[in-house]
């Protein structure tokens, strides 16, 4: 995963700036409630900010640190070198998006929708993504480490080279013809055997 391209000295902002191109700012404890469809955000850091009723279209080199998102949409969004760290992202819409070199770390994201998205060189690290949907997604060089993936849906998504061995995957829903190449631990393998309709007797 490529490193963020953020200046070491960012201009401090105490409120949102209404510009079409927002670059090289750090926002702290700011509440943002507006449509950001026509705004390109580049090289910024958001710390302990709240986003409500927002939608994004293009994000590059951004850190969201301890932020809360309510009714926020990243549908059909391009995210490049974006880090979500210790954020509350439950219910967020990421469908039909392109994510490159993007990090989700220590986030709570129940029932997120990633359907139809493409992930390239992304990292999911110690997140709770219970009930989220990864339907018809495309993964390239993407990792999941110590994530809670219980009751997630992966229909029509190739799981080749995805490593779930350190994750919780209880009640995961997948397409049986897309399992080739997935990496799981021995106990998880039994769950996948059940998904295939195979009965195991001791």
Report the location of each language-model feature.
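Tandem repeat scaffolds
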Residues: 2-202
């Amino acid at each position: 995963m490529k490193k963020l391209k953020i200046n070491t000295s960012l201009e401090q902002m105490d409120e949102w700036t209404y510009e079409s191109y927002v670059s090289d700012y750090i926002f702290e404890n700011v509440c943002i409630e507006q449509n950001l469809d026509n705004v390109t955000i580049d090289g910024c850091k958001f710390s302990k900010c709240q986003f409500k009723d927002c939608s994004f279209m293009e994000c590059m080199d951004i850190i969201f640190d301890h932020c809360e998102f309510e009714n926020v949409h990243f549908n059909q969004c391009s995210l490049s070198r974006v880090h979500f760290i210790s954020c509350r992202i439950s219910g967020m819409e990421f469908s039909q998006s392109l994510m490159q070199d993007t990090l989700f770390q220590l986030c709570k994201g129940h029932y997120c929708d990633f359907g139809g998205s493409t992930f390239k060189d992304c990292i999911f690290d110690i997140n709770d993504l219970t009930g989220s949907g990864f339907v018809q997604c495309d993964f390239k060089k993407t990792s999941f480490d110590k994530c809670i993936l219980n009751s997630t849906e992966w229909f029509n998504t190739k799981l080749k080279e995805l490593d779930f061995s350190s994750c919780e995957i209880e009640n995961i829903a997948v397409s049986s013809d897309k399992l080739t190449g997935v990496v799981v631990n021995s106990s998880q393998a039994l769950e996948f055997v059940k998904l295939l309709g195979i009965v195991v007797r001791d």
